[in-house]
Swiss-Prot record:
Protein name (Swiss-Prot/TrEMBL): 33 kDa chaperonin
Record InterPro entries: Heat_shock_Hsp33 (IPR000397), Heat_shock_Hsp33_C (IPR016154), Heat_shock_Hsp33_N (IPR016153)
GO biological process: protein refolding
Post-translational modification: Under oxidizing conditions two disulfide bonds are formed involving the reactive cysteines. Under reducing conditions zinc is bound to the reactive cysteines and the protein is inactive.
Record localization: Cytoplasm
GO molecular function annotations of the record: protein folding chaperone; unfolded protein binding
Record's function text: Redox regulated molecular chaperone. Protects both thermally unfolding and oxidatively damaged proteins from irreversible aggregation. Plays an important role in the bacterial defense system toward oxidative stress.
């Protein structure tokens, strides 16, 4: 079962979060039929969105979008406060080979921007954007948190893809210091992080999320919260129809005149919906 653990280093002002989301990323891989570079990129963005979701309040959502000039083009993951996540990659059939014995996600992403959109339950979304620093996702998220959110943060994300393309390990961790954090603790954590093995390696060794945090920081953790990560897409035919309404009466009339059923496929879960001409006529009368 995929999980997330959120806590504090005991007696210190340091927030720590870790997630293992191997099953979720493997489920997404199967839905989108991704090749290794696309799988690794999507998996990292999924893990990153879960880490950021740990800071949300009830019923809030967050979307992480990576938009680059590399062959992947766009990678998106959305997570809510219940750690329900969904994702897609614009070009799923991409494999760029290895770099330093790891899947070369940076070359697949290229140069571009990281966009974070927060749905806080208000009338408008809160959106911020930073330029990609490496395209490897983890450092880009850390840069976003440091620059846009003004929160000193360290982020590590990892996805291990087997030769048969299946996902053997996926997850990540995030460490955030606060203004009250002692300088000695910051320096200690910096040293520990420089010695830390990769996230995917720790998952492959059988560590759970709490054990990963304890391994990374080397200090006792006070657990604040545990949650379960699941892949979930809330799309419905009603939502499809509502989207068609936004096109306006003129566009709907054109669809009716063409006399063809409207076929819609959800980006996130690949579920297909059909809206018949008769349904379009009823819709036009109601708006």
């Amino acid at each position: 079962m995929d999980e997330v653990v959120k806590g504090l280093i005991k007696n210190e002002h340091v927030l720590v979060v870790a997630t293992i989301c191997t099953e979720t990323v493997e489920y997404a891989r199967k839905i989108h039929d991704t090749w290794p570079t696309a799988t690794a990129a999507m998996g990292r963005v999924i893990a990153g969105s879960v880490l950021l979701a740990s800071t949300l309040k009830d019923r809030q959502k967050i979307m992480v979008q990576i938009k680059g000039d590399g062959p992947l083009n766009e990678v998106v993951a959305e997570a809510d406060s219940f750690y329900r996540v969904r994702a897609y990659v614009k070009r799923p059939h991409i494999y760029m080979g290895l770099k330093n014995e790891k899947i070369d996600v940076g070359r697949g992403v290229g140069k571009g921007f990281l966009n974070v959109i927060r749905d806080l339950g208000l009338r408008e979304y809160y959106q911020s954007s930073v330029e990609l620093q490496t395209g490897e996702i983890a450092r880009d998220l850390a840069y976003y948190l440091n620059v846009s959110e003004q929160i000193p943060s360290a982020v590590s994300l990892g996805v291990y893809v087997e030769p048969d393309n299946s996902v053997k390990a996926a997850g990540g961790f995030m460490i955030q210091t606060m203004p009250e954090t002692r300088t000695e603790i910051v320096e200690f954590l910096e040293r520990k992080l420089s010695e830390t093995q990769s996230t995917s390696s720790m998952i492959l060794q059988g560590m759970d999320s709490l054990q990963i945090l304890e391994e990374v920081v080397g200090l006792p953790i006070e657990v604040l919260h545990r949650g379960t990560v699941t892949y979930f897409c809330p799309c419905t035919k009603d939502r499809v129809i509502n989207a068609i309404v936004t096109l306006g009466r003129e566009e709907i009339q054109k669809m009716i005149e063409e006399g063809k059923t409207v076929d819609v496929e959800c980006y996130f879960c690949k579920k297909k919906y059909e809206v018949t001409v008769e349904e379009l006529k009823i819709l036009l009368r109601e708006i």
